[in-house]
């Protein structure tokens, strides 16, 4: 379950110093029950993002489509 961010640098998996900790904090803020981490999606031709295990389903829906900008 990915979370997105309006800041484009959010997608650059592995490019940012402290990115893993950023994902841990971001996933925790979204209500993930487990530690989040950065996950690349290059093989699928997609940008990477923070992968949050066991994210509440209502939060997941909020992070896609028209409400994508609401994710912080």
From Swiss-Prot:
SUPFAM superfamilies: Scorpion toxin-like (SSF57095). The keyword Methyltransferase does not apply. This is Phaiodotoxin-2. It comes from Anuroctonus phaiodactylus. Expressed by the venom gland. Disulfide bonds join 13-38, 23-50, 27-52, 63-71. Has the structural arrangement of an alpha-helix connected to antiparallel beta-sheets by disulfide bonds (CS-alpha/beta). It is found in: Secreted. Keywords: Disulfide bond, Ion channel impairing toxin, Neurotoxin, Secreted, Toxin, Voltage-gated sodium channel impairing toxin. GO terms for cellular component: extracellular space. Residues 1-72 form the LCN-type CS-alpha/beta domain. Sodium channel (Nav) specific neurotoxin. Belongs to the long (4 C-C) scorpion toxin superfamily. Sodium channel inhibitor family. One of its GO terms (molecular function) is sodium channel inhibitor activity.
């Amino acid at each position: 379950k990915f979370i997105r961010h309006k800041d484009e640098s959010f997608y650059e998996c592995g490019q940012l110093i402290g990115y893993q900790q950023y994902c841990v904090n971001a996933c925790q803020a979204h209500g993930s029950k487990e530690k989040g981490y950065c996950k690349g999606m290059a093989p699928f031709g997609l940008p990477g993002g923070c992968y949050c295990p066991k994210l509440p389903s209502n939060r997941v829906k909020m992070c896609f489509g028209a409400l994508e900008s609401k994710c912080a």
